[in-house]
């Protein structure tokens, strides 16, 4: 009986090793996880600005600092640990530093000037997209450790979506945010996640390997072309989620760097918040 249990455990370990080996040579998974790890880790860049936006809501500031920030930081740490265990040749520190130096000066610019309601709506978009990404990853991953990591992240981002959605409903009446303004904000947040956040996180991934990379290098356009059908196939998208991902299906466009909003009061409510991507 003991010998049977030992053989079963050995088979399980062998199966897990084979699954990890398959992941190790999967370029799409590497680029997805590495980009996600950067964006999760970079959340502190957004916290101070968000605290200013929601300064009148002390409960929101407390939640951002005690729940949202630590939760995102934990996901960043878990992703980094997984990456370093699976792809030890990849220099995560150097790649993240390059991303951080490029991302920091521009992060959050598109959201400055937006009110609390539109900022909350942009954060809804970000959380929904992240939850869908992780859900697709959990449903398609062969390795148990990766499935567990992705499921936890999907659940946590889903909880953030619920929080930001309730916050948007709470703020929109005071700021008189209309349907068209909301829709423009959603579209702008989706495009910003696609053209700025994910693109910036993707940019340094091919340049920081010690020796020959174990995965083929992907251009960002090719990455998008492969990632979108994977999400469509494995994430079980609802109607609203399909709308959120529509911009990812559009043709590539050269996206300008986010600019500070023009000082035109009558247009301010149309400015989309800069989402915190995942």
Listing of model-derived features with the role each one plays in the protein:
Residues 1-278:
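Non-heme di-metal
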């Amino acid at each position: 009986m003991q010998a049977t249990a030992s053989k079963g455990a050995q088979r399980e370990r062998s199966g897990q090793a084979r699954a990890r080996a398959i992941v190790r040579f999967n370029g799409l998974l590497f680029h997805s996880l590495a980009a996600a790890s950067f964006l999760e880790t970079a959340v502190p860049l957004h916290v101070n600005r968000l605290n200013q936006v929601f300064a009148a809501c002390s409960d929101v500031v407390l939640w951002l600092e005690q729940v949202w920030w630590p939760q995102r930081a934990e996901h960043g740490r878990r992703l980094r640990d997984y990456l370093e265990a699976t792809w030890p040749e990849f220099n995560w520190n150097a790649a993240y530093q390059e991303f951080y130096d490029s991302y920091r000066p521009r992060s959050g610019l598109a959201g400055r000037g937006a009110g609390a309601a539109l900022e909350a709506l942009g954060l809804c978009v970000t959380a929904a997209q992240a939850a869908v990404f992780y859900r697709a990853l959990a449903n398609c991953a062969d390795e148990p450790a990766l499935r567990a990591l992705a499921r936890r992240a999907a659940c946590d981002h889903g909880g953030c979506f619920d929080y930001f959605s309730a916050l948007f409903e709470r703020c929109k009446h005071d700021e008189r945010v209309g349907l068209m303004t909301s829709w423009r904000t959603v579209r702008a947040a989706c495009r910003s996640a696609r053209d700025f956040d994910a693109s910036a996180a993707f940019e340094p991934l091919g340049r920081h390997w010690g020796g020959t990379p174990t995965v083929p290098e992907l251009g960002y356009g090719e990455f998008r072309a492969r990632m979108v059908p994977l999400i469509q196939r494995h994430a079980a998208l609802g109607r609203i989620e399909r709308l959120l991902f529509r911009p990812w299906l559009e043709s590539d466009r050269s996206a300008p760097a986010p600019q500070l909003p023009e000082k035109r009061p009558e247009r301010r409510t149309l400015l989309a918040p800069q989402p915190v991507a995942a």
